[in-house]
């Protein structure tokens, strides 16, 4: 065990994490030259394309150090994005060390900070590496200073490297051997293994990526998953060098995979503890939590005949994405579809994109909404994830909405516009600090304001320079109301929305005006109203199409004209009582993709 080193790489998007991993694998001869492809560890096409890492991957590398000994280095690649922060914390708790990769030309960014704090809390040794030193605009001294100011770790001996040219790779490996502690653990104790990640393989079922904390695991052992209580027979264990290589056993301190013929990914939860069914460990490893979706949206097939196909596609995605939740939902407007829960906005975009790309689906997505806690008058608490499920106004005692803590980094010339944006989104400033040219802002903002378009607006007011990271803080009482849309006095469930009371009139006005342009004119007047409970707060009319009944009267008596007009009016009134208004699909899309102008 003295020769094992487990480490991961923390970095912001595009700071060169995956390229660095490629170089380390190449230097240790993990893959033959012909098998190297850029970003070896990012196995999904969408990961390569967006340049992000979604699932954790590992590589077990053999490194011959300068002291002549051979070390087993286990590289655990972590996702860097905020939506996957739970996966990050699991990956980090399986390591003793982490490389903090900072782009020497850009300095520290928001996500790096969040993940780095997670690492420090978990007691992981953090080794700073300044990457992209081959760029002419690289400024190592400023970057060093920023790491010390913002994160507060000593960066005087940070390794200068360039993953692209291969400079500094040997130094990084030597630093890992010298500074990352060897794993602690007892190979003779009861088996405890932490599930870092799990995914579904078409041939063998669920593959679990684990870090063995104590004990030894061999094939043919009967294993118990502590959170779900399921038992399975372990069929195969091994390591990835990124290719999978079977082994006869995995012992304490090692990182590898277990295949046990599990059919459902839901049984192998990330962060769960694996132990032997025969002699189980006394307690599971700490830190396991069920991943709860934060953002909900409806997904509907454009063609209602594709409903079954959409369900199959979602089920296939769920095999590899335990955090995705979905349940069937029917809407008057869009037909049959699903209410899906996601970890955050990026997760939602990725699911949509994978549905479109891998399964060739055409889908309509409704505007994302968040989960509210509604306390009713009788004391019961209801969890509401869609406007249609909000109880009636009279029954509600209190509504609580999720608040997130947002960390923002930006060059100081953009502080003004970014602060204005946060204040418009009902944000409360908690902290602000200057680090060289960078400014670090902390805000508490309701999640509902962030899911709509906060990220896009942030990028546009800061010309793309601001970076953000958010984490869930708590539920807080809020004055939010459900705004219903009525067409000729009938509620349309699909168009209801939950908004803050202060913005309600403004949003209602906006939506009603937009609807007026989208509903085609009928033979009778159509009233479009927005209401909170019974109080109408905005109204527009779509005027009726009418025939000119007076065309045949030349001159003549006024009473004759009046009679014809009265007759027309009575006819229209009768039509209005029996006629129904067809709402075109475009009208729904216009509302659901509502922008705060």
UniProtKB/Swiss-Prot annotation:
Query: Taxonomically, what lineage is the organism?
Result: Bacteria, Pseudomonadati, Pseudomonadota, Betaproteobacteria, Burkholderiales
Q: What does the UniProt entry say about where the protein is found?
A: Cell inner membrane
Database matches in PROSITE patterns: G_TR_1, G_TR_2
CDD domains reported in the protein's UniProt record: EF4_II, EF4_III, LepA, lepA_C
Read off the InterPro entries from this record.
EF-4 (IPR006297), EFG_III/V (IPR035647), EFG_V-like (IPR000640), EFTu-like_2 (IPR004161), G_TR_CS (IPR031157), LepA_C_sf (IPR038363), LepA_CTD (IPR013842), LepA_IV (IPR035654)
Query: Per its record, how is this protein called by name?
Result: Elongation factor 4
Q: Which residues form the signal peptide?
A: none
* Entry's Gene Ontology molecular function annotations: GTP binding; GTPase activity; guanosine tetraphosphate binding; ribosome binding; translation elongation factor activity
């Amino acid at each position: 065990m003295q020769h094992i080193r487990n480490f991961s790489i923390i970095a912001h998007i595009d700071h060169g994490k995956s390229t660095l991993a490629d170089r380390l694998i190449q230097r240790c001869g993990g893959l033959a030259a012909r098998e190297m492809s850029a970003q070896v560890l990012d196995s999904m096409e969408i990961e390569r394309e967006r340049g992000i890492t979604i699932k954790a991957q590992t590589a077990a590398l053999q490194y011959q150090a300068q002291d002549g000994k051979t070390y087993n280095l286990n590289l655990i690649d972590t996702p860097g994005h905020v939506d996957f922060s739970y996966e990050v914390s699991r990956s980090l708790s399986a390591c003793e060390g982490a490389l903090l990769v900072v782009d020497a030309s850009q300095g520290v960014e928001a996500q790096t900070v969040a993940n780095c704090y997670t690492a420090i809390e978990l007691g992981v040794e953090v080794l700073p590496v300044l990457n992209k030193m081959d760029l002419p605009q690289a400024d190592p001294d400023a970057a060093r200073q920023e790491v010390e100011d913002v994160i507060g770790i000593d960066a005087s001996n940070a390794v200068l490297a360039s993953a692209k040219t291969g400079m500094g790779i040997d130094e990084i490996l030597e630093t890992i051997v010298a500074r990352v502690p060897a794993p602690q653990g007892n190979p003779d104790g009861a088996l405890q293994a932490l599930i870092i990640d799990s995914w579904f393989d078409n041939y063998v079922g669920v593959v679990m990526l684990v870090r063995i904390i104590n004990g030894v695991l061999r094939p043919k052992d009967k294993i118990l998953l502590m959170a779900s209580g399921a038992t399975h027979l372990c069929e195969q264990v091994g390591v990835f060098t990124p290719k999978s290589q079977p082994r006869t056993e995995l012992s304490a301190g090692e990182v590898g995979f277990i295949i046990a013929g599990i059919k459902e990914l839901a049984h192998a939860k990330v962060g769960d503890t694996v132990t032997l069914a025969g002699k189980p460990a006394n307690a599971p490893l700490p830190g396991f939590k069920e991943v709860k979706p934060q953002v909900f949206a409806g997904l509907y097939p454009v063609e209602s005949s594709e409903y079954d196909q959409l369900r199959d596609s979602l089920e296939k995605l769920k095999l590899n994405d335990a955090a995705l939740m979905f349940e069937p939902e029917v809407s008057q407007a869009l037909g049959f579809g699903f209410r899906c829960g996601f970890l955050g906005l990026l997760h939602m975009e990725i699911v949509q994109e994978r549905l479109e790309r891998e399964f060739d689906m055409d889908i309509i997505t409704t505007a994302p909404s968040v989960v509210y806690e509604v306390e009713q008058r009788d004391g019961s608490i209801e969890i509401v994830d869609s406007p249609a499920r909000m109880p009636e106004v009279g029954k509600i005692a209190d509504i609580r909405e999720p608040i997130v803590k947002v960390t923002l980094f930006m060059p100081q010339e953009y502080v003004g516009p970014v602060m204005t944006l946060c204040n418009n989104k009902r944000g409360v400033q908690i902290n602000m600090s200057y680090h060289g040219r960078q400014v670090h802002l902390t805000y508490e903002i309701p999640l509902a304001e962030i899911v709509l378009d906060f990220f896009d607006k942030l990028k546009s007011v800061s010309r793309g320079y601001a970076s953000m990271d958010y984490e869930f803080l708590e539920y807080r009482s809020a004055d939010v109301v459900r705004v219903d849309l009525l067409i000729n006095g009938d509620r349309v469930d699909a168009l209801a929305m939950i908004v803050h009371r202060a913005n309600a009139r403004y949003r209602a006005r906006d939506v009603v005006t937009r609807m007026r342009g989208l509903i085609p004119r009928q033979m009778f007047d159509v009233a479009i109203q927005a209401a909170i409970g019974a109080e109408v707060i905005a109204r527009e009319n779509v005027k009726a199409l009418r025939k000119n009944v007076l065309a045949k009267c030349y001159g003549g008596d006024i009473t004759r004209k009046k009679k014809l007009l009265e007759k027309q009016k009575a006819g229209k009134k009768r039509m209005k009582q029996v006629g129904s208004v067809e709402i075109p699909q475009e009208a729904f899309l216009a509302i659901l993709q509502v922008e705060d102008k």
